[in-house]
C-alpha cells in the first residue's frame, strides 16, 4: 500500500524501462529468471551493456539526424552515465556506429549522479572556447530501473518512484548552425553544501547499485537556494524577474514544488521541468 501511495504522489504518468520484467507483456529476463527479485550486480550490469550500448548509439544518431552538422564535423565526444560500466565503452560504440573519425577526442563522466549532464555541457563549452573549430557531441544514458530493490526500505521506494530509463544528448559547437534555433551556453556556476551528503548518495552493492535519497533533500535545497542564486544574478546583471522559464532538474515532484514555493515562482514557470518529470 505504501508503494502505491508513493507512486501515486510522484507526479509521473509514464516510466520507461529497458527491463522486460516491468512490462505487462514482457518476459522475466532479469529479476525473475531464477535469481528471484534480487539479481546480482553482474546480471544487472550485463543488461546495462546489452541495452545501454544501443541507446547510446540511438541518441547519437538522432543528434546527427536532427542537426546541421555532419559526422566529419565532430571533434570531441563526451559520454555520461552512472548506472553501469563496460570497456571499450559507449564512446567506442558511437564512433564505430556513426563512422566518426578515429582521432576524435573522447571523455567519459561516470558515477557522478544525475547532475553529470551539466558538467558535461560545461566541458563541451570549455572545449569550444579553447578551439574555434571544435564541435562536441554529448550523450547521456541512464538505466536506473536495472537497480530496482525489492525491499521495504523508504530510500529504495522513493528512488524507484522517481528514476527510470532514457537517454539525451546535445551538440555543442563554436560554429552557429546554418538552420533552426539553438541555445547559447553563456555560463555555469556550481556550489557544494555539506548538509546533504548523508541524504543523497550512490554506491555499488552486491545486488545492484544502492541509492540513498531521503525525504529531507527538498528542504536542504530550499535552505541553500537564495544564497546560491543571488551571486549568480549579480554576476550576470539580471534579476529573478528577468527569467520567464526555469529548467529545474526534475528529481521528484517534491523538489519542484519546493523550488517553486521558495522562489515564489508563477505556476507555469516550471512547466518544462514538470513535463519532463511526467
Residue positions per predicted region:
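Condensing-enzyme catalytic core mediating Claisen C-C bond formation in acyl metabolism
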Residues: 1-49, 135, 144, 148-223, ...
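Claisen-condensing/thiolase-fold acyl-transfer catalytic domains that form or cleave C-C bonds
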Residues: 47, 82-84, 89, 96, ...
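Short coil/turn segments at secondary-structure boundaries
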Residues: 39-54, 78-85
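Acyl-thioester C-C bond-transforming condensing/cleaving domain
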Residues: 54-73, 82-205, 268
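Conserved beta-strand elements of the Class I
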Residues: 75-78, 135-137, 244-247
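Generic structural marker for isolated residues within well-ordered, non-membrane alpha-helices
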Residues: 3, 60, 91, 229, ...
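Phosphate/pyrophosphate-binding loops at sites that engage ATP/ADP/AMP, CoA/4′-phosphopantetheine
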Residues: 59-74, 227-244
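Short polybasic/polar patches that bind polyanions
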Residues: 8, 18, 40, 65, ...
Amino acid at each position: 500500500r505504501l508503494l502505491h501511495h508513493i507512486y501515486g504522489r510522484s507526479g509521473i504518468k509514464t516510466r520507461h524501462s529497458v527491463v522486460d520484467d516491468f512490462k505487462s507483456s514482457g518476459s522475466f529476463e532479469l529479476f525473475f529468471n531464477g535469481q528471484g527479485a534480487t539479481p546480482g550486480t553482474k546480471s544487472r550490469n550485463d543488461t546495462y551493456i546489452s541495452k545501454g550500448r544501443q541507446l547510446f548509439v540511438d541518441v547519437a544518431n538522432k543528434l546527427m539526424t536532427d542537426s546541421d552538422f555532419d559526422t566529419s564535423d565532430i571533434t570531441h565526444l563526451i559520454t555520461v552515465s552512472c548506472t553501469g560500466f563496460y570497456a571499450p565503452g559507449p564512446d567506442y560504440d558511437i564512433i564505430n556506429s556513426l563512422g566518426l573519425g578515429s582521432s576524435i577526442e573522447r571523455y567519459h563522466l561516470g558515477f557522478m549522479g544525475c547532475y553529470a549532464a551539466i558538467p558535461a555541457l560545461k566541458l563541451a563549452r570549455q572545449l569550444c572556447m579553447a578551439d574555434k573549430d571544435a564541435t562536441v557531441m554529448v550523450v547521456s544514458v541512464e538505466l536506473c530501473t536495472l537497480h530496482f530493490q525489492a525491499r521495504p526500505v523508504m530510500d529504495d521506494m522513493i528512488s524507484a518512484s522517481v528514476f527510470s530509463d532514457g537517454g539525451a544528448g546535445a551538440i555543442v559547437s563554436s560554429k552557429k548552425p546554418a538552420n533552426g534555433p539553438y541555445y547559447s551556453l553563456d555560463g555555469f556556476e556550481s556550489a557544494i553544501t555539506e548538509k546533504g551528503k548523508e541524504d543523497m548518495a550512490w554506491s555499488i552493492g552486491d545486488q545492484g547499485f544502492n541509492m540513498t535519497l531521503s525525504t529531507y533533500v527538498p528542504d536542504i535545497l530550499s535552505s541553500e537556494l537564495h544564497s546560491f542564486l543571488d551571486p549568480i544574478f549579480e554576476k550576470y546583471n539580471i534579476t529573478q524577474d528577468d527569467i520567464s522559464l526555469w529548467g529545474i532538474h526534475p528529481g521528484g515532484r517534491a523538489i519542484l514544488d519546493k523550488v517553486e514555493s521558495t522562489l515564489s515562482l508563477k505556476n507555469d514557470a516550471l512547466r518544462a521541468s514538470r513535463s519532463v518529470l511526467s
